[in-house]
Amino acid sequence: MVLLRDFWDSSHMTYRVLDSIAVFLVSIGAVCGADKSDAKALTVAEVLASSKPSDWRPLDAENTIYLELPQGRVVIELAPSFAPLHVANVKALAREHYFDGLAIVRSQDNYVVQWADPDAEKPDLKRKIVQAKATLPPEFERALAPNIPFTRLPDGDVYAPEVGFSSGFPAARDPKTGKMWLVHCYGMVGAGRDAPADSGGGTELYVVIGHAPRHLDRNVTLLGRVLQGIELLSALPRGSGPLGFYEKPEQRVPIKSIRVVADIPATERSVLEVLRTDTPLFQQLIESRRNRREEWFHYQAGRIEICNVPVPVRKQRSTPTPR
């Protein structure tokens, strides 16, 4: 009966059955493995140590960007499956060097770091856009589709009917409405906007550096996540102005450049790989975080929320698949 309740329409019945069975098996594993003495229960480190090269994937150079700061490099993976218009526009902005010389203008404690054109409100001084667009229609959510992978967490969520992971990104979905969307976990990247839903386009971007502000879900277009270098953003001095904006120009952090990795010589790239989220090993990883088996832990929660399952990233060890 539990599986039957998961059906939401006949056209998606097959993938819903498989999804429900996977969650059911994870839940059964949690019950059967509740005893610390269970030899089959693995720690997070043990799960990762058992991974094979096929459990990892290389980054797509065309959908990865580098934010270059004086302090170092921030690697951001883009999410064209969820925000194709914004991803294309951010890449267009990067390729016309729009971001070069702009600045991080906001660092709000336990919330976000944001970069933009400090002179955006001054017609004579604001940065010119050549071929990219200043604004776009919102991409707050997208339609469910059989070709979009989704590994569902078994423990429910407060903000959405279902949450899980899609190609490494934390996501949510509603089978009744047939919609899915990215969620605001630590390190997620979004496009700033004004009050109108279509007033953003990627010229202003922010990164979550605090407790997950899930109330922003489906109110802002999320278009990627930071894979490496988040500490360069989260450790910035906080802005003293309203909402954490820097009040003095000298407080801002200059942006050296934002580049699409495909445009950068291979010898200058940060060669990383990300744990796939559509494998049995990732299901094991979820279970190892739902019930922590490390010796330090004396109590297993038996559940997990979406933003407490970080997807591992490492320097590439396997032979990359050409992309």
Where do the language-model regions lie?
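Bacterial N-terminal signal peptides that target proteins for export
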Residues: F7-I21
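Cyclophilin-like peptidyl-prolyl cis-trans isomerases
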Residues: D9, G33-R323
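Bacterial N-terminal signal peptides
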Residues: D19-G29
